[in-house]
Curated annotation (Swiss-Prot):
Pfam families: Anticodon_1, tRNA-synt_1, zf-FPG_IleRS. IleRS has two distinct active sites: one for aminoacylation and one for editing. The misactivated valine is translocated from the active site to the editing site, which sterically excludes the correctly activated isoleucine. The single editing site contains two valyl binding pockets, one specific for each substrate (Val-AMP or Val-tRNA(Ile)). The keyword Nucleotide-binding applies. ATP binds at K625. Zn(2+) binds at C908, C911, C928, C931. It catalyses: tRNA(Ile) + L-isoleucine + ATP = L-isoleucyl-tRNA(Ile) + AMP + diphosphate. Catalyzes the attachment of isoleucine to tRNA(Ile). As IleRS can inadvertently accommodate and process structurally similar amino acids such as valine, to avoid such errors it has two additional distinct tRNA(Ile)-dependent editing activities. One activity is designated as 'pretransfer' editing and involves the hydrolysis of activated Val-AMP. The other activity is designated 'posttransfer' editing and involves deacylation of mischarged Val-tRNA(Ile). This is Isoleucine--tRNA ligase 1.
Length: 945
């Protein structure tokens, strides 16, 4: 460079190293993202990731299947993007982390769609064919939506619960749990939807407010003498009266068969204008007020003394068909919070009622069960036959009144069970169903299903940790699992049952395997068309095909069997490392998967469970059509970019509710721009840098460059620890701070002078570029799991010879000698710089200086601050971005200060520094000596910055 002096002539404009990059400032995301999606598919990027990951330890995130019905909504986007971030971050952490997406394909919602389109009278074979076609069409539609969000996975070979192999394996799983002795058939009250005409799983029930009649009903004394003795009386002072119950379901009264009292609650005999009334003593005052009566307690007794007393059915006077009595059974579940402390018991329509009546010797055939599957009473029911239970409610109230049994009738607003699909009220209804027994021991002995599942919960890692207690409580308190459904489009419970006894065929296990083989070839349709004689010969005279299908929660709940160890066993493995779903899946997929794996394997199918919250608007309200506050992910992707949705999800603490609004998206977009601008600066300043030829070893870097790389490496270690625990929002927060403050607000700000004004190939500039290269290598990789489109776009500019960033692992930064001490020193220097910046700002406000380069500063410092500042020598001015800087030692911290003065020297046209040597070379009157040297001689020497 020394021979340049000969060529030096005055120039109209002196060159600086201002470089450009094909990485644009504007992301133009809605236009460019779909091109990346196409590019990834065309070049087989997912397959390349798999090839690059081969032989590494596996990490399996098992996809909880969305239902193959309808467009994807924001909740889907949250779920799929979180999964994508987990999978990408695990791949980059050095695992082989495949992602096989899946779909739940059977069940009611699809049947409803087929009914809507084609009516209810289609033959079964046509329902099946149309349901398969519909599910396929929905899957393709959803698949496009998921890919548009930047989610990479095995889209060409997803799992579907309706694939023949999966259907067959599900039947085999059923065979296994029968073999282990968990399955039984019984009459039991189950959640029943009249519109579905089927039992519902717990997860298919939601609660909504509704108003129902609330009535207090008198059951007249049937055994007055025994009642008197129970109360310690010789006889009752009068014959009229009885025991009083309170209910919000008048429709259950025709099926009443018992009364429940708490053994330890004290019951009172109250003398009133309506006769003698029996109720809990602590409810007397409230009830008298409600009934408009005055009453006097004449005797008291604990509930246990009233056990087995009988009272007349309250409709006995209305119709001879109700001339029966109801016995008193004791139950610990009776409370005195509301009502009378007496519960009327219709065992066909309440779980506790059923359990209590069965415990007192009632058989299935004794149970009165007049409500049919469509919600109507059987025709033979006295007074109300043929009516729906809802239409019958007011008529039952009228009949009770006419019979003299009604004490009070009001309307009552309460939270009540509804079908999640039809949004209509449901009931408990005793039906003959197939169950998995929660308190059943397996055939070979050992722990019950409930005990095994609770142990499995204890052995599982939960993110966030409160999920453990929630799932534990659900398993501890849940009833037996109703496995059967009364539908067509579902995997059959392919049993042959005895026409008279209902017993399973003795060869059931062998027959299930035969059916599974046929289903493997032809799908579940094979069972529909099967003639029983083909498999059981003349036994077909005694046995018939069971018509029930499996609960769809069994379909998805056995994917650990028919996907992880079935259709996709080559890609996946059991148990999965992680299941990741919304918090509603504690009673849904997490729950059913846990129960099936506990039955099949005696353990959970997952090592960890991650739960995310639901989306709400900016005011914390749930998204709903009525509020009009829903946000469509397609619309946001097409307007702002899927990257903005991804960044919003990554930056939100998903363990709670995820708030979204236009204001929030605006803030996210601004945050995105800051990151993008940082990347653009890095790429532009590396555009003339070839690492192989131009990089310097760390020992030759300037001190601030060593600090920057040491700091970036330390930050990366923190980020990877967050990634390992699936904590994304701290990753985003720290990276945004890194880009805006550590890089933009400090390091890159200091670096600009050296990058722009040093000779292009000078050691000072190459030192800066080498550091920037390492920072960019690291930064793009830690951004890639959530800013996938942007990281890939930047990577193609940065490393054009590389196929994709997603085959990379996290960057191994070069070792920096004394990194810890270096970071501590520069943290101190940045602290001082903050004080100087403040002083410069005050001087600017007072119009003493224009830009900071117009200033010369004197920093008075003590102790370690002085040592750190003094060690920079003349380079201190570059760190403070002033034209001159001196440091003066003082003894005490209290004497420290920053003095700012305006420079009296002229301004260099090229570097904008105010220097005494501007114009020192007559041929270049507007250049300072530093710029002259950098342009025409050997260039300035720097050591620190």
């Amino acid at each position: 460079m020394s021979n340049k002096k000969a060529d030096s002539k005055p120039q109209a404009k002196y060159p600086v190293n201002l470089l450009d990059t094909p990485f644009p400032m504007r992301g133009d995301l809605p236009k460019r993202e779909p091109q990346w999606v196409e590019d990834w598919e065309a070049r087989g990027v997912y397959e390349k990731i798999r090839a690059a990951s081969q032989g590494r330890p596996k990490f399996i995130l098992h996809d909880g299947p969305p239902y193959a019905n309808g467009d994807i909504h924001l909740g889907h986007a949250v779920n799929k993007i979180l999964k994508d971030m987990v999978v990408k971050s695990r791949n980059m952490a050095g695992f082989d982390a495949p992602y096989v997406p899946g779909w739940d394909c059977h069940g009611m919602p699809i049947e409803i769609q087929i009914e809507k389109r084609f009516g209810k009278s289609l033959p079964a074979a046509e329902v099946m064919a149309k349901a398969r076609a519909y599910a396929t069409e929905q899957i393709e539609k959803q698949k496009v939506g998921f890919k548009r969000l930047g989610v990479l996975g095995e889209w060409g070979n997803p799992y579907k619960t309706m694939n023949f192999q999966n259907e067959a394996e599900e039947i085999r799983a059923l065979g296994k749990i029968i073999e282990k002795g968990y399955v039984y058939r019984g009459l039991k009250p189950v959640n029943w939807c009249f519109d579905c005409g089927s039992a519902l799983a717990e997860a298919e029930v939601e609660y909504k407010d509704r108003t129902d009649p609330t009535i207090d009903v008198l059951f007249a004394f049937a055994e007055p003498e025994k009642t008197a003795h129970a109360f310690g009386l010789a006889e009752l002072p009068r014959a009229e009266g009885g025991i009083v119950i309170w209910t919000t379901t008048p429709w259950t009264i025709p099926a009443n068969q018992a009364l429940n009292l708490h053994p330890e609650i004290v019951y009172a005999l109250v003398d009133t204008e309506r006769g003698l009334l029996v109720m809990a003593e602590e409810r007397v005052e409230a009830c008298m007020k409600d009934f408009g009566l005055t009453g006097r307690v004449i005797a008291r007794t604990p509930g246990e003394k009233l056990a087995n007393l009988r009272f007349h059915h309250p409709l006995a006077a209305a119709h001879p068909g109700y001339k029966r009595t109801s016995p008193v059974y004791l139950g610990d579940y009776v409370t005195t919070d509301t009502g009378t402390g007496v519960v009327h018991s219709s065992p066909a329509y309440g779980v506790e009622d059923f359990t209590s009546c069965k415990a007192h010797g009632m058989t299935d055939s004794d149970i009165i069960n007049p409500v049919m599957g469509d919600g109507r009473y059987i025709e033979s029911l006295p007074l109300f036959g043929g009516l729906t239970i809802w239409d019958a409610n007011p008529k039952i109230v009228d009949a009770l009144k006419a019979a003299g049994s009604l004490l009070r009738n009001e309307r009552y607003a309460h939270s009540y069970m509804h079908c999640w699909r039809h949004k209509t009220p449901i009931i408990y209804r005793a039906t003959s169903q197939w169950f998995a027994g929660m308190d059943t021991q397996p055939a070979g002995g050992g722990k019950t299903l409930r005990e095994t599942a609770l142990d499995a919960v204890d052995a599982t890692a939960f993110y966030p940790s409160w999920g453990k207690q929630r799932l534990h409580a659900m398993i501890a308190n849940r009833p037996d699992w109703t496995l059967s459904r009364q539908r067509q489009w579902g995997v059959p419970m392919a049993f042959f049952v005895h026409k008279e006894t209902g017993e399973l065929h003795p060869r059931t296990l062998e027959l299930l395997e035969e059916v599974a083989k046929r289903v493997e070839r032809q799908g579940i349709e094979a069972w529909q068309t099967l003639d029983a004689r083909e498999l059981i010969g003349d036994d077909a005279n005694l046995y018939e095909k069971n018509r029930d299908t499996l609960d769809v929660w069994f379909d998805s709940g056995t994917t650990h069997w028919h996907v992880l160890r079935g259709s996709h066993k080559d890609q996946l493995q059991f148990p999965a490392d992680l299941y990741l779903e919304g918090s509603d899946q504690h009673r849904g997929w997490f729950h059913s998967s846990l129960l099936t794996a506990s039955m099949l394997d005696g353990r959970a199918p997952y090592k960890g469970l991650l739960t995310h919250g639901f989306t709400v608007d900016g005011e914390g309200r749930k998204m709903s059509k009525s509020l009009g506050n829903g946000i469509d992910p397609h619309e946001v992707a097409n307007r702002l970019g899927a990257e903005i949705i991804r960044l919003w999800i990554a930056s939100t603490d998903y363990s709670g509710e995820l708030a979204i609004s236009e204001e929030i998206l605006k803030r996210v977009t601004e945050g995105y721009r800051r990151i993008r601008n940082t990347l653009r600066f890095l790429l532009a300043n590396l555009s003339d840098f070839d690492y192989a030829k131009d990089a310097l070893p760390a020992g030759q870097w300037l001190e601030i460059d060593r600090y920057a790389v040491a700091f970036a490496a330390q930050l990366q270690a923190e980020l990877l620890a967050h990634y390992e625990k699936y904590e994304f929002h701290p990753v985003v927060a720290k990276l945004q701070t890194f880009c805006s403050e550590d890089l933009g607000g400090f390091y890159l700000d200091v670096l600009k002078d050296r990058l722009y004004t040093s000779a292009p190939a000078s050691p000072a500039r190459r030192s800066a570029q080498t550091a920037l290269y390492h920072v960019t290598q690291g930064l793009l990789r830690v951004l890639a799991p959530f800013l996938s489109f942007t990281a890939e776009e930047a990577w193609r500019v940065f490393q054009p010879q590389s196929d994709t960033i997603f085959t990379e692992t996290y960057y191994a930064y070069p070792e920096i000698a004394g990194a810890e001490a270096l970071i501590a020193k520069w943290t101190l220097l940045r602290d001082v710089r903050g004080d100087v910046t403040k002083a410069l700002e005050e001087a600017r406000t007072a119009n003493r200086i224009g830009s900071s380069l117009q200033a010369q500063v004197e920093v008075r410092a003590s102790g370690a601050r002085y040592d750190a500042l003094a060690s920079l020598g003349d380079d201190l001015k570059f760190v403070l971005i002033t034209s001159a800087a001196t440091v003066v030692k003082v003894d005490a911290q209290g004497d420290e200060s920053v003095d700012v003065a305006a420079s009296t020297y002229p301004k260099c046209e090229r570097c904008w520094h105010y220097r005494e040597d501007v114009g020192a070379h007559a041929d270049h009157p507007t250049l300072c000596g530093r710029c002259f040297s950098n342009l025409f001689e050997n260039g300035e020497t720097r050591s620190a910055a």
